[in-house]
Swiss-Prot record:
Record organism: Acinetobacter baumannii (strain ATCC 17978 / DSM 105126 / CIP 53.77 / LMG 1025 / NCDC KC755 / 5377)
Keywords, sorted A to Z: Cytoplasm, GTP-binding, Hydrolase, Magnesium, Metal-binding, Nucleotide-binding
Gene: obg
Residue segments, region Disordered: 120-143, 381-406
GO BP annotations listed: ribosome biogenesis
Ranges of residues in domain Obg: 1-159
The name this protein goes by in its record: GTPase Obg
Length: 406
């Protein structure tokens, strides 16, 4: 199934049914009085998180949703039936944004969590409500109110504890295959991974975390190179970034230069995202002779001036991967425990997350607009080039025809 992480839809709740003006008409009951019923309430529209849904692709093809109108009231004080509600299911991790105001309507992070995005109209009042001592036969009734109408944007960010970061073909997909049951496509060419992949990593019994593999970045991604920075937003909800470095790139490039390029692109996209804890993994050690591995790895670390945690692995042979898993599990558990025990730290984490969410959303929208502008400029340039092919100045091959009347 095609992975879609954004969609814009319109939702319109049902209008309320109309109240009616009716009078009781029964044999032997003169002056029965008003008995008009109220209109039913219009159906509302809800969006609900669902574990069985993994993409927003359905909302790319069906963009308009409307709930049922409430039924009109009837005589004998009968209230009209309410309109049926509409429930739209989306993946867990979906943020709902009002496109007009930019306000966040809801953030669905748990299975079954539900948010109302359009409220149904109220039913109108029947004439029973308007009787009084001075008006015993009111003919007044009211119509139902209009249902709420909205245009909303659905934004999906995968929920994971650890996010994989690195150049294309650095071995991220091979690594996640080695430590989890996830089976992303693996091949010997760049950009094998085209969409985010999630895997549950089991450290020990009852100890596990979720890891996300996103498509690789290249230098200039912030300007739209490669797959651009479209998928970087999926790292916004992770706790730790795992930077995978290919120690022996197939194109002969410098691993340290590649790592610096990734760090720069990350900082360009979101300075807040770049502040997340980063763990370095020097991968594909099997590509280097055993006697020169330590020296080469140390050279890379010296070039990067790296002082943080670092691991040396071979995802293909699954060497050193367990140590990475245990370290990540310990770090995640420590963060979780501290958030529970220290309210001040928990508040700081929430503020950091809110800032990160806002920053990544803003940068993603800006990047999309810049990409559209670039594509428009390219199309215009292409049209200009086509026009240049028709040069009217050169008339060497032109033939002038003169018609003479006999």
């Amino acid at each position: 199934m095609r992975f879609v992480d954004e969609a814009v839809i319109t939702v319109e709740a049902g209008d309320g049914g109309n109240g009616v003006a009716s009078f009781r008409r029964e044999k032997f009951v003169p002056f029965g009085g008003p008995d008009g019923g109220d209109g039913g309430r219009g159906g509302s529209i809800y969006i609900q998180a669902d574990d069985d849904t993994s993409t927003l692709v359905d909302y790319r093809y069906t963009r308009k949703f409307r709930a049922e109108r409430g039924k009109n009231g009837a005589g004998a004080n009968c209230t009209g039936r309410g309109g049926e509600d509409v429930v739209l299911k989306v993946p867990v991790g979906t943020t709902i944004v009002d496109t007009d105001s930019g306000d966040i309507i809801g953030d669905l992070v748990e299975d079954g969590q539900r948010v109302m995005v359009a409220s149904g109209g109220e039913g109108g009042l029947g004439n029973t409500h308007f009787k009084s001592s001075t008006n015993r036969a009111p003919r007044k009734c009211t119509t139902g109110t209009k249902g709420e109408f909205r245009e909303i944007r659905l934004e999906l960010k995968v929920l994971a504890d650890v996010g994989l970061l690195g150049m294309p073909n650095a071995g991220k997909s091979t690594f996640i295959r080695a430590v989890s049951a996830a089976k992303p496509k693996v091949a010997d060419y760049p950009f094998t991974t085209m969409v985010p992949n999630l895997g549950v990593v089991d450290a020990d019994r009852h100890r596990s975390f979720v890891m996300a593999d996103i498509p690789g970045l290249i230098e200039g991604a912030a300007e739209g190179a490669g797959l651009g920075i479209r998928f970087l937003k999926h790292l916004a909800r992770t706790r730790i970034l795992l930077h995978i470095i290919d120690v022996q790139p197939i194109d002969g490039s410098d691993p340290a230069h590649n790592a610096k390029a990734i760090m720069n692109e990350l900082a360009k996209f979101s300075p807040t995202l770049a502040k997340l804890p980063i763990v370095l993994v020097l991968n594909k050690l099997d590509q280097i002779a055993e006697e020169s591995r330590e020296e080469w790895c140390q050279h890379i670390l010296d070039e990067l001036q790296w002082t943080g945690p670092v691991f040396k692995t071979s995802g293909l042979l699954e060497e050193g991967t367990k140590e990475v898993v245990y370290y990540l599990m310990d770090q995640i558990e420590q963060q979780r425990e501290r958030e529970v025990e220290d309210p001040e730290y928990a508040a700081e984490v929430r503020a950091f997350r809110e800032q990160l969410e806002a920053e990544t959303r803003e940068q993603t929208i800006a990047a999309k607009e810049a990409y559209r502008a670039m594509r428009k400029a390219q199309r215009l340039e292409s049209m200009m080039d086509d026009d240049d092919d028709f040069d009217d100045d050169e008339d060497d091959g032109d033939v002038e025809s003169i018609y003479v009347r006999d």
